[in-house]
Each structure stands twice: as C-alpha cells, then as structure tokens.
C-alpha cells in the first residue's frame, strides 16, 4: 500500500505531497513537457505565460528562458540587505546541499535572466525565481491532472 503525505486544513483545503505523484525534479518534468511534439508551449505553460505577460510580454527568446532551470544563491541570501544589492558573483551561488558551484555556463544563464528581464536587484531575481518556480509547478500539475483524467478517467487530486 502506498502512503501519501497530506495536510488537511478544514474540510475543503488539502495539501498533498506532489513527489508521490510526480517523483522527478521540476527541471525534468518541465523538460518532458517542452519536448512534447507539436506542442504550443504558451498553452502547455499557460500559468507561466499568463503571469509573465502581465509584467512584460515575453518574446520567444524570453519565454524559452522561462522554461530553463533557474538558479538561486540560497546560502548567500542570509540578510534583508542583500535583496537591495545587484547580482552577486558566481562563487556566491555555491550549493551546500550538493557541494557544487555553478558552472560558467549556468552563471551566464543567470546573467542573461538578469539582463533579459531588466533586473536591478537581488529582490528582482528572488521574485522572478519564486514566481517562475510556482508557475512551472502549477503548469506541470495541471498537465499531469489533464492527462490522468483523459487517459484513466481519474482525478489525482
């Protein structure tokens, strides 16, 4: 029997552990959707597109950037003052959990994000990172739910 982690908040709101349904990283789930043949990415990723078009309508290049893995300097962001600073150097993106640094190519992607979306501060990058992550997660769940209902006639949520 499979076990699912769920938190019940009253009678109408339930938070379920999505990893039980989709046991892959968000990066892998998104790349699977991106590779769908004949797929319109603005339809597959409608939450992502809807959110970012209200701020600054993304052209194709900018929208492709949204579909890539994003990077965040978790350990570096240890004070409110750092939200007011500009983009930190590459070594500040060190990941203690995985014991790895960003590659030059990965940092170049961060610089490209900063430039493409007219960011000035780490607050801008932080908000972009969180909003992009949540929108991609929502789109991934919605695609999984639609597929489950279409193929199996079951709503996983």
Locations of regions flagged by a protein language model:
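Metal-dependent nucleotidyl/phosphoryl-transfer cores and adjacent nucleic-acid-binding surfaces
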Residues: 1-157
